[in-house]
Amino acid sequence: MGKIIGIDLGTTNSCVAVFEGNEPVVIANSEGKRTTPSVVAFVDGGERKVGDPAKRQAITNPTRTIFSIKRFMGENWDQVQKEVTRVPYKVVKGDNNTPRVDIDGRLYTPQEISAMILQKMKKTAEDYLGQEVTEAVITVPAYFSDSQRQATKEAGQIAGLEVKRIVNEPTAAALAYGLDKAHKDMKIAVFDLGGGTFDISILEFGGGVFEVLSTNGDTHLGGDDFDQVIINWLVQEFKNDEGADLTQDPMALQRLKEAAEKAKIELSSSTSTEINLPYIMPVNGVPKHLVKTLTRAKFESLAHGLIQACLEPCKKAMSDAGLSNSDIDEVILVGGSSRIPAVQKLVEDFFGKTPSKGVNPDEVVAVGAAVQGAVLTDEIKGVVLLDVTPLSMGIETLGGVMTKLIDANTTIPARKSETFSTAADNQSEVTIHVLQGERPMAAQNKSIGQFNLSGIAPARRGVPQIEVTFDIDANGILKVSAKDKATGKEQAIRIEASSGLSKEEIEKMKAEAEANAEADKKEREKIDKLNQADSVIFQTENQLKELGDKLPADKKAPIEAALQKLKDAHKSQDLAAIDTAMAEINTVFQTASAEMYAQGGAQGGAQAGPDMDAGQNAGQDNSKHGDNVQDADFEEVK
């Protein structure tokens, strides 16, 4: 039996691993790197480049360089409108209401672009193993819908791979982390914040059994969004300075994207970074430069809402698992965006423990996929993986209601049947409209397919008995059947993404030399002081907003005056004035706080002050609305 490779098909980067010599091995690509950028470029002469070579030429070829394609996988046109405006390449509406990438008039589906990345990973593994590879385990975000999972499987098929299993990314990470601990009894939380998606999964393992207790997340929250807040800030700064809009220039937009990503990465290890983009755009015929210093504190204030958006899925996952935070033995961080210090602090504060640093966030998912491949080939024995379906599945019934057959966090594989009936006399046909989501009404959930069951024997309303069966396989992919018990007639469909893909083979990709990057050193003391001032400004503004009317006007005025002094000192980079202003803010805040306590005005016992973290969760409605659908023509038999 040949090797089953494990592939982490990521939004920003991809990684491939294989189980060899009784351990999983991460395979370096032809550039010598263990991760490969999920970037595809179309260059002159019909050549395609994948990975680092594609990423390197993106600035000079922005409209034909494709990145973050994972965010379009398995989605319809209406669901990706925000993503379309963020990328410099052209995305258009294609067949079956799906998004397509337009390259010189040729429309590529997201599956085809993803297949080119998978082809690169396949070739990387083949070069390492010295043999052809035809089978793979591919990972997906835990919160991927049925259509997104099916699209991933199709991408594998186009790349010439038989996808033996689709595994949730946090589950794969837990498998890699716990392989040598499989016989210990542990409960772990996997916090996976990648380039485009966020997942939180709660798992329990012991005796070789890995069981997912719950999962939650957001398939449109990740590193791309953190990049975007930096891009938005740079665009606004340039507009303020020069009166021109950088988003109207695809090449400038691509340069902003790369600069924002680089700045974000540098701010995980530095407190400040300089963004220097010479000749970014001509204004009235004069070339203009964009040079800005971004501190970590400023970045965290820009990304505050995104960071806080990670909290609610964590709370929901813990609630669904029926556990308290103290029950968790270990917290595992996965995904490049989990390196952001503010994200790590949020995780530590929420779970009450320091996250484990024992895994590589960029590689652990691919390692887990390789472990699952070895389980399937019996190279690893005594390990059982019990995953769950992330979202509820059901059908539309009378009145546009969603009737659930399989609840979220049900262990898969799973099978469930329920009996329904007709909604009108002598009805000879019913439409089975299959839905996925947690909302009560069908129109509020995602439509993932529909089919008709015809030939029902004429009878009065409510008499026929239609048995609907949902069958979810180990990949989380759904098959639905409907059977008329009276006539025995049956109709079934395997829910698939409406991709309209042809199955032609994708040509192999070429790769070039590794990229080089440089970072300039900064004057540490000065940057630390500016960073501290930035942080105090942000926290002071936050607390003034929270205190609102509780803080009398005569107490608020000196605080606002001191705050303005600090802003002026920060702008002029006068370090002595910064120290004076910060001390003044601290003094006036403490005076106001003490007087509020004395007057009984303090609420909840929390002291206000610029040294405290006053960030609050940003309440967000993250519900995703599906397409409008017709009312069903049958009702549930009670």
From Swiss-Prot:
Residues 601-638 are annotated as: Disordered. Induction: By stress conditions e.g. heat shock. CDD domains: ASKHA_NBD_HSP70_DnaK-like. The modification Phosphothreonine is found at T197. InterPro entries: ATPase_NBD, Chaperone_DnaK, Heat_shock_70_CS, HSP70_C_sf, HSP70_peptide-bd_sf, Hsp_70_fam. GO terms for molecular function: ATP binding; ATP hydrolysis activity; ATP-dependent protein folding chaperone; heat shock protein binding; protein folding chaperone; unfolded protein binding. Keywords: ATP-binding, Chaperone, Nucleotide-binding, Phosphoprotein, Stress response. GO terms for biological process: chaperone cofactor-dependent protein refolding; protein refolding. Pfam families: HSP70. Acts as a chaperone. Belongs to the heat shock protein 70 family. This is Chaperone protein DnaK.
